[in-house]
Amino acid sequence: MKLVFYGAGNMAQAIFKGIINSKKLKSHDIYLTNKSNEEALKNFAEELGVEYSYDDEKLLQDADYVFLGSKPYDFEKVAQRIQPYINENNRFISIMAGLPINYIQEQLQVENPIARIMPNTNAQVGHSVTGISFSGNFGPKSKEEVNDLVNAFGSVIEVDEDHLHQVTAITGSGPAFLYHVFEQYVKAGTDLGLEKDQVEESIKNLIIGTSKMIERSDLSMEQLRKNITSKGGTTQAGLNALAQHDIEAIFKDCLNAAVHRSVELSKNEDN
């Protein structure tokens, strides 16, 4: 199986690092290309031990899956660049936020099978949660192959394309939202008088330990919280303070804003 990546940004890098680390494919079956920065592309390809090229005809002639990972606003130029060399065996996997399948097909001027995936940067460590939607002409075997590829860097949620907006908000942008929460936790802990490096290390291990508890327990997160919250204790006092600031409403606003922006991008052909 030959994979070609158009675009080598942060998300694309996380994906092909995840695939390489999974050893599902040999590195010489993965090809990278970008818009113009050949030196950076060469260095990165050599670092990973994968191939790189700017010869679109060569890249596409026997490519099984073509990952579209350019910036959404660059896609029209990418489509014009590769359209003459697309063949019927190419299947496309888009990681471009906000661009619907029908728009991608229009720009490529083809009816080849197209999947849209919305991973997150945890793909780099094999723990992305990836939403995926398929065009109607994606066959069962091809779906299985794509799911197998995506499972190489985490877990998969297959949804209707309209629901990718919600997946984008919850899991696609999720790592950034959680990093921001942890960042504020570090600042608040440092304000209590502890050294910043002590607080950062403590919270890092707190996050790891709590994640393992969630992973290994059959209990809901709500029940896990209740199990360590004693009436009148310190944990209850802190939770009461969070409730006064309506943390539930804060997260709803956060996710709704991300969904709204994803919908906006999908309606804007000038992305």
Swiss-Prot record:
Annotated keywords: Amino-acid biosynthesis, Cytoplasm, NADP, Oxidoreductase, Proline biosynthesis
Top-level taxon of origin: Bacteria
One Pfam family here: P5CR_dimer
InterPro entries: 6-PGluconate_DH-like_C_sf, NAD(P)-bd_dom_sf, P5C_Rdtase_cat_N, P5CR_dimer, Pyrroline-COOH_reductase
Pathway: Amino-acid biosynthesis; L-proline biosynthesis; L-proline from L-glutamate 5-semialdehyde: step 1/1
Locations listed in the record: Cytoplasm
Cross-referenced Gene3D superfamilies: NAD(P)-binding Rossmann-like Domain, ProC C-terminal domain-like
GO biological process: L-proline biosynthetic process
Chief site of localization: cytoplasm
Listed GO CC annotations: cytoplasm
Record EC number: 1.5.1.2
Family listed: Belongs to the pyrroline-5-carboxylate reductase family.
Protein name (record): Pyrroline-5-carboxylate reductase
Gene designation: proC
